[in-house]
Design a protein with these regions (language model features):
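Local beta-strand/beta-hairpin segments that build beta-sheet-rich folds
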Residues: 132, 172, 243-245, 397
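Generic structural motif
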Residues: 19-20, 26-32, 156, 188-191, ...
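Surface-exposed cap/loop segments at beta↔alpha junctions
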Residues: 1-68, 180-189, 194, 198-205, ...
């Protein structure tokens, strides 16, 4: 079964929201209600002495002796009566520091005991504390969407009048500022996921999800429809038969008619490719600190990336120019031989390539039409090493006539020890300076320029086979984290990879295979190919995936 869960959320509202409620148990914390995007709050199925709440089937847990250490969300002090209503309605207030827009509010109650509020009033207020919208709702399930497009609200008051079952506490787990739209087998027409990795680190691929579905909710020209509230980084969770196939983010929707919409989505690596990293000169920089610097600049939370400790503890030197955050991570990946990937999750994972074989793709999983290619022999690999040193004399990094204002000036080469005339430097780095001009006129920024001295480092075959021609691969000279300290190691690693000359491309019935993993594949003449899966093009409906595996030939294992 295909499930594509689309979070139509105001992606900034959760972090900007502060909740308060007077009618709440002392062990409950309403601040956890505002979970971001498609993240879910994990709450244990506690037993209570409420009417008919404790099922004697082993599904409930004995209530904690230290409930303050557990997660509850909003658990009210008041209990509903025999008529399911509270003696006094319970109010939850959500305050924001800036205006937001939403297509509605999704309320998530206790699914394990199928209980929820029986009536809710939502009131929206603007920045002047004026009521701009209100509506009553009557939930009929533990997850309920309060549908209403509201723009520029800065406070929401939710009033709960009772519970769906008598003599119950109100138990609200999450408040989502938007809608959760689920596309499944009944509505999805087609759905493809592309997963790619480059074991050399020469390219940092963007995984994609593209699907077409029957829906009338996304009329692109309807100013009152759901699309009117869409924002960047809307999350879409992809699952096949309950297994997580990743979290993607809306890139661009398009419609050919009134009933279908095609959603083109990218992974987190694609998201950070839309923003710039200002770079810098690095001398004996801890890679963990460098990656943290890149991620912080990209507004990626620590929980949204994973860096293997074997990489984090390494030291690196060199230079990163102004580039996208994705390109900055690619520089790190190439210099360290790391794989950077988001496959089957949301977080950006940075980890070393592995030679552990995960399993075998047997003939009965392969579709007809596989092509095996024996690539041209690589007899050598050359990389360009960079050494950065400050020039002994100052030079101009920038000179121009500017009017009054604040400017970000970028340089064509890295500089240090910057000074300015005609302006004040507010902040700066090796590649840029933010300046303020108070009086219009000539502005000059001077400093000591870093000079890049390059050399070529190569690894070559000791002997060529008979009739073989030299075939030396020259790697990108713009890999500026390659220095005399690591150039030999990088060239050796690349040379060894290029000795894997077999490529197998074709369709398979997808099982547990993932891009970036090492697998064996039954091939020709009772032999196997063993290597890295570099490419998986997954049809989510049929379970068939186009695969590309690069490796070497091995004897068939019995």
């Amino acid at each position: 079964m295909v499930e594509l869960k689309y979070g139509l959320f105001d992606v900034t509202a959760a972090d900007d929201s502060t909740q308060s409620c007077a009618d709440v148990q002392p062990f409950a914390d309403v601040s956890v209600l505002n979970t971001p995007d498609l993240d879910s709050l994990t709450v244990k199925p506690w037993e209570t002495l409420e009417t008919n709440q404790w099922f004697l089937d082993g599904s409930k847990l004995i209530f904690s002796d230290e409930p303050e250490k557990e997660v509850f969300g909003l658990w009210s002090l008041s209990q509903s009566g025999n008529d399911c209503n509270f003696a006094a309605p319970i109010t939850l207030t959500c305050n924001f520091t800036k205006p937001h827009t939403t297509v509605g509010i999704t309320l998530i109650f206790r699914e394990d005991s199928n209980e929820y509020a029986n009536k809710v009033k939502l009131q929206y207020y603007n920045s002047s504390n004026e009521l701009i919208a209100e509506q009553d709702y009557y939930p009929d399930s533990p997850m309920y969407f309060c549908d209403k497009l509201v723009e520029n609200y800065q406070k929401i008051i939710l009033t709960f009048y009772g519970t769906s079952l008598p003599n119950r506490y109100l138990k609200l787990l999450e408040v989502k500022f938007g809608a959760i739209k689920i596309f499944d087998d009944d509505s999805v027409i087609s759905a493809q996921i592309l997963e790619e990795v480059d074991p050399t680190g020469a390219e940092l691929s963007i995984n994609t999800l593209e699907f077409t579905a029957y829906t009338t909710d996304f009329a692109l020209l309807d100013p009152n429809g759901i699309y009117a509230a869409l924002q960047q980084r809307q999350a879409i969770g992809a699952k096949i038969d309950g297994e997580n196939f990743g979290t993607f983010f809306l890139d661009e929707p398009e419609s050919e008619d009134d009933d279908t919409t095609t959603f083109k989505c990218i992974d987190f690596v694609g998201v950070i490719d839309t923003t710039d990293f200002m770079g810098g000169i690095y001398m004996n920089k801890n890679i963990g600190a460098l990656v943290s610097e890149i991620m912080t600049s990209a507004e990626v939370e620590p929980s949204e990336y994973e860096l293997d400790s074997s990489i984090a503890n390494q030291i690196i030197s060199g230079y990163i120019p102004i580039c996208t955050h994705r390109e900055a991570l690619q520089q790190v990946a190439f210099a360290t031989g790391s794989i950077v990937d988001c496959s089957r999750g949301k977080a950006i994972k940075i980890y070393p390539a592995s030679d552990i074989v995960k399993g075998t793709i047997t003939h009965d999983k392969k579709m007809s039409g596989h092509k095996v290619k024996y690539t041209t022999l690589v007899t050598g690999v050359e990389v360009t090493s960079h050494r950065y040193a400050l020039q002994s004399e100052q030079s101009n990094a920038y000179e121009d006539t500017l009017s009054v204002g604040t400017y970000t000036i970028t340089f064509s080469a890295p500089f240090a020890s910057l000074t300015a005339s005609g302006a004040t430097i507010l902040s700066s780095g090796a590649n840029y300076a933010v300046i303020r001009v108070i009086t219009a006129g000539k502005v000059t920024i001077t400093g000591f320029q870093y000079e890049d001295s390059t050399s070529v480092v190569g690894i070559y075959a000791d002997e060529l086979p008979a009739n073989a021609k030299a075939n030396v691969i020259s790697c990108d000279s713009n890999a500026t984290l390659i220095t005399p300290l690591n150039a030999q190691e990088v060239a050796q690693r690349l040379y060894e990879f290029y000795q894997n000359r077999y490529e197998d491309e074709g369709d398979i019935l997808l099982g547990e295979e993932k891009a970036g993993e090492v697998w064996r594949m039954n091939s020709l003449n009772d032999r196997d190919l063993q290597g890295v899966i570099q490419h998986l093009d997954i049809d989510m409906i049929t379970g068939v995936a186009g695969v590309k595996l690069t490796g070497s030939a091995k004897a068939r294992e019995s």
